[in-house]
């Protein structure tokens, strides 16, 4: 974490030695137009006026060592927030999170908005992938983005009323009035289901054109979940397509405002339901930043060990289902059997299989069981042989290679423009793995390589990178097995939740703390924190705001699959329907990760 508390006479925290980009910004814009915000995010956060958004973002994207990727864009309802000392007056805030690969650095631009003038210009002309993020921000907060090409609902149904992430909006179903389906409501709902190509941005280029429209999904086996793609076809050729998401939306960010810091942990498992403990990591680390908790080394290694086991399991499922999409039926049945062996290890350690909810604020739920080394040893001896079997039997098959090579291809520029992370980005030749570039939880102490591609990310290079990542995860697990630190499985920090059982049985104060933290939740100091990790499908992160309460004031979950699906039309236009199936299988996504 970087300290940016030292203010100069202009009221702007000038820490130019730490953030060289400030020198560049102040050479073009007046420093009085910037307000720096100190947080626990470890990221430079700057507040600017709304009329400066496009000039500032354009400058950041085109400067030397540019902030080339729009990583995230969303909003905050500030109206009930108490701890806002030193920040500009704001009822609602829009934030833009940019990443510079060359600098290995981030910057967050925040724009304050008042309720009576809740609008801002779209930045789609600067960052193409802002399109979906702005649509989601509009439908969740009611913030209007001027000149947006298609400002319509994206997550919620078309006939939905209200803005769910506003503070006055109910957080529980029981807070709504009883549902009554009137004839008028039914007619509106049915009308919303009518397909009108113009409403989806699909148009004829001339009056003589006569294209066919086809719904792929939302219940097609090759769309990997409840996901619909509307195709505009000229024969078998895809002229245009529009992804239709939101069927799996559960309001995960809204739930974060009603659950305690501790009781929200099970929800993190279900954001991307195949990742298990991998999904718990960014949330737990972000909360620990807010609480000021440093965990023991044993906790760090245990967390890495569980994360890599889940990574291998997720990759095995991805590889086998992708092969099934292409036409090879046997691998998926074999892989499900193989994955159970890894689940056996996970269950022996955590007590659960897919959704363990096992990480804790300040540690893990309990220590490793006796005999865990033998279980892991047997698993590590077996995994490489099985992966080698899949490679030799199918992935190196000439028929499969001809079917996958060159399909769904894009270069590094396209990947960065659309916010692609994970194997899709690394296949373009960019070595950007958060475990290496920005180590967390002790990854800096592990020896492993980051597989990258040769410049073009296509349906074959992406799956082969996942294979190499399995081998690297095995290397990491070998080091966990050989170098597991001795020590406690939980920090003795007062905000570690729940506290160590041994202390609670001996000290009445600790017993009271246990009761309060588990029932009401720990009171986390007011601040903002952020943590990104290398998840199974790309970069996943949590941006948390605490207002000094037992629950999060704002929980922003950025998942990798959301931008990956937004990229589909750009990549697949001009291809065949059969190529789309191959491309979809190579992305590696689940709809819970998209819709949250």
UniProtKB/Swiss-Prot annotation:
Coiled-coil regions listed in the entry: none
The reaction(s) this protein catalyses? a quinone + NADH + 5 H(+)(in) = a quinol + NAD(+) + 4 H(+)(out)
Locations listed in the record: Cell inner membrane
Listed A to Z, the keywords are: Cell inner membrane, Cell membrane, Membrane, Multifunctional enzyme, NAD, Quinone, Translocase, Transport, Ubiquinone
Asked whether the keyword Hydrolase is assigned, the reply is no
**What PROSITE patterns has UniProt attached to this entry?**
COMPLEX1_49K
Q: How is it placed in the membrane, per its record?
A: Peripheral membrane protein
A GO molecular-function annotation: NADH:ubiquinone reductase (non-electrogenic) activity
Which cysteine pairs are covalently linked by disulfides here?
Answer: none
Q: Per its UniProt entry, what is the enzyme's top EC class, as one word?
A: translocase
Provide an example Pfam family for this protein: Complex1_30kDa
Annotated EC: 7.1.1.-
The main location class comes to: membrane
Region of interest called NADH dehydrogenase I subunit C, as start-end residue ranges on this chain: 1-186
Task: Show the PANTHER family listed in the entry.
Answer: NADH-QUINONE OXIDOREDUCTASE SUBUNIT C_D, NADH-UBIQUINONE OXIDOREDUCTASE 49 KDA SUBUNIT
Q: How does it assemble?
A: NDH-1 is composed of 13 different subunits. Subunits NuoB, CD, E, F, and G constitute the peripheral sector of the complex.
Q: What does this protein do?
A: NDH-1 shuttles electrons from NADH, via FMN and iron-sulfur (Fe-S) centers, to quinones in the respiratory chain. The immediate electron acceptor for the enzyme in this species is believed to be ubiquinone. Couples the redox reaction to proton translocation (for every two electrons transferred, four hydrogen ions are translocated across the cytoplasmic membrane), and thus conserves the redox energy in a proton gradient.
Q: Which family does it belong to?
A: In the N-terminal section; belongs to the complex I 30 kDa subunit family. In the C-terminal section; belongs to the complex I 49 kDa subunit family.
* Record-given protein name: NADH-quinone oxidoreductase subunit C/D
Organism listed in the record: Blochmanniella pennsylvanica (strain BPEN)
């Amino acid at each position: 974490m970087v300290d940016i508390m030292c203010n100069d006479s202009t009221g702007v925290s000038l820490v130019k030695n730490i953030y060289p980009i400030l020198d560049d910004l102040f050479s073009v814009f007046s420093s009085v137009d910037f307000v720096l915000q100190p947080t626990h995010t470890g990221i430079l956060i700057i507040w600017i006026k709304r009329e400066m958004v496009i000039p500032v973002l354009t400058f950041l994207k085109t400067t030397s060592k540019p902030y080339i990727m729009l990583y995230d864009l969303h909003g905050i309802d500030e109206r009930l927030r108490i701890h806002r000392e030193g920040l500009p007056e704001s009822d609602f805030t829009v934030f833009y999170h940019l990443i510079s690969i060359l600098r290995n650095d981030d910057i967050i631009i925040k724009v304050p908005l008042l309720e009576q003038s809740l609008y801002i210009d779209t930045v789609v002309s600067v960052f193409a992938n802002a399109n979906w993020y702005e649509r989601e921000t509009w439908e969740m907060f009611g913030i209007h983005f001027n000149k947006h090409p298609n400002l319509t609902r994206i997550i919620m149904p078309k006939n939905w009323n209200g803005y769910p992430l506003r503070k006055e909006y109910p957080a529980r179903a029981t807070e709504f009035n009883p549902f009554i389906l009137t004839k008028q409501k039914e007619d509106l709902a049915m009308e919303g289901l009518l397909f009108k190509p113009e409403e989806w941005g699909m148009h004829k280029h001339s009056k003589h054109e006569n294209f066919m429209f086809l719904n792929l999904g939302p219940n097609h086996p090759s769309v990997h979940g409840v996901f619909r793609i509307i195709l505009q076809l000229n024969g078998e050729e895809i002229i245009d397509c529009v992804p239709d998401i939101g069927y799996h939306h559960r309001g995960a960010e809204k739930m974060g405002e009603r659950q305690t810091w501790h009781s929200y942990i099970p929800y993190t498992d279900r954001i991307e339901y195949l990742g298990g403990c991998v999904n718990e990591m960014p949330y737990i680390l972000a909360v620990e930043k807010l609480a000021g908790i440093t965990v023991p080394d044993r906790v760090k290694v245990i967390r890495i060990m569980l994360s890599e086991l889940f990574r291998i399991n997720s990759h095995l499922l991805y590889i086998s289902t992708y092969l099934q999409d292409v036409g090879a039926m046997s691998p998926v049945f074999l892989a499900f059997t193989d994955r159970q062996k890894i689940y056996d290890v996970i269950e022996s350690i955590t007590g659960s299989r897919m959704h363990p909810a096992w990480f804790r604020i300040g540690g893990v739920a309990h220590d490793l069981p006796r005999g865990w080394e033998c279980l892991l040893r047997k698993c590590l001896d077996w995994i490489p042989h099985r992966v080698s079997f899949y490679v030799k039997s199918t992935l190196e098959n000439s028929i499969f290679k001809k079917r996958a090579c060159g399909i769904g291809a894009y270069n590094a520029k396209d990947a960065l423009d659309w916010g692609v992370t994970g194997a899709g980005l690394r296949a373009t030749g960019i070595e950007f793995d958060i475990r290496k570039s920005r180590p967390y939880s002790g990854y800096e102490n592990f020896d492993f390589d980051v597989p990258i591609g040769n410049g073009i990310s296509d349906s074959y290079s992406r799956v082969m990178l996942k294979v190499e990542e399995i081998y690297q995860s095995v290397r990491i697990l070998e080091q966990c097995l050989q170098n597991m630190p001795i020590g406690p499985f939980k920090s003795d920090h007062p905000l570690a939740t729940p506290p160590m059982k041994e202390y609670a049985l001996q000290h009445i104060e600790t017993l009271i703390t246990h009761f309060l933290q588990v029932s009401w939740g720990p009171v986390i100091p007011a601040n903002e924190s952020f943590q990104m990790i290398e998840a199974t499908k790309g970069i996943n992160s949590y941006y948390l705001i605490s207002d000094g309460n037992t629950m999060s004031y704002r929980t922003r979950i950025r998942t990798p699959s959301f931008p990956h699906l937004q990229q589909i039309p750009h990549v697949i236009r001009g291809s065949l329907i059969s190529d789309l199936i191959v491309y979809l299988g190579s992305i590696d996504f689940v709809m819970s990760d998209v819709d949250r």
